[in-house]
Every structure is written in C-alpha cells, then in structure tokens.
Amino acid sequence: MKSAFLIAAPTSGSGKTTLARGLMALFTQQGHRVQPFKCGPDYIDTKFHEAVCHRPSINLDTFMASEEHVRELFRRYTQGGDDAPAWAREPADVAVVERMMGLFDGYDRYHGSCADIARVLDLPIILVVDASSAAYSMAAILHGFIDFFPDLRFSGVIYNKVGSPRHAAMLREVAAEVGIACLGCIPKQAALIQGSRYLGLDFSEHTQDE
C-alpha cells in the first residue's frame, strides 16, 4: 500500500466528511484503488464512501472490537490476500480513514475515539479545522491537539471555510509557527455546505440511489 492516513477534526461540522469524500473521489479518478474506513459504528458516511470508491467502507471500532481485531480488519482490507473478500483480494493503493465527532471524543474520555484508532494502527493524522472565525487563535488550538497526546503523528492541517487570501496567509503563518505542515486552505463556499440528518450529512440530492 502506497499511503494510509486518518482524517480528523476538533469537532463535528468541521468539514472532514466532505473533504474525505473529495479526496477519495480524486484518488479513485486518478486510477488508485482506494479503501475507505469509518471509525465507529457510523452507517451513513460509509454509504457515501462506497459511492465514490466503488467498494465497501469498513467500520473500525475499538469499543465494539478488540485492538487485535481492528488491526486484522485493516490488514485484510488494505493488504488483500486469500482471506479477504473477492473485491479486496488485490492490495489497496490508498487507505483513507475518517471519524465522526472530534479527534479525542470516545465513549470514556478518548477510549474508542479517532485518536484511539490512530494509535492502534499507527496512522498519521490530517487535521481539518474550521477556520471561519479565527486567525492567530488557531495557534493555541493546533498546539493543544498536537501536544495533548504526544504518541500521535500529525501529517498536517487543512483549514476549512477560509475567508480570504489574506486570511489564508495568516493561517499558513500560524501552521509554520506551530510546526505543522499546512496542506491546504479551502475557501468558504456555499456550494460546499451540506445539510445534516440523523447522525451524519445529507448528500441525498447528490447520490443516484435516493
């Protein structure tokens, strides 16, 4: 497998599902075999993952399953082999793992959280942050997430809902000062705003099966 990473955010509503879906679609269009995963028992976002990756999204849950089982699931659906389903026999090129809620939100403090999955699988984290109402205050937010659990690895930050080129420049300076790579700045766009229903986003108008 060429690449595997986890997409997380400080809170729900930061844009991680929309970003994850976009990256999955991009990698798939480029000809990569993309294996999607969802942290926790979420049954809505996995449907959206499958729509763009053309293969089932697998749930990873350290509350419902042991750490050993989570590692085995990840291995089976990324590395392939005879013990994998027919559609997963060939190794994946890219694995994208997404989580609902915030990075450290679990059933008991951080246990069962996205951070727990990142720790168990030793995956680098891309942090998606809603930057619509902050500039230099982002330094404190980024420091807090990076320093809170030193065992985690952060590949970088993607700022969402950025207001202007000047705002983006300020946010890039913040990332450089904190010591984390700025992987991108997504401008605030009405077209990217998704409604929500039940436990997840509502993409019904964009899917063919609804």
Where are these regions (language model features)?
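Short hydrophobic alpha-helical runs that function as membrane-insertion/retention elements
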Residues: 125-128, 183-185
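Internal gly/pro-rich beta-alpha loop/helix module
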Residues: 136-210
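ATP-dependent carboxylate-amine ligase catalytic core
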Residues: 2-14, 18, 24-121, 129-152, ...
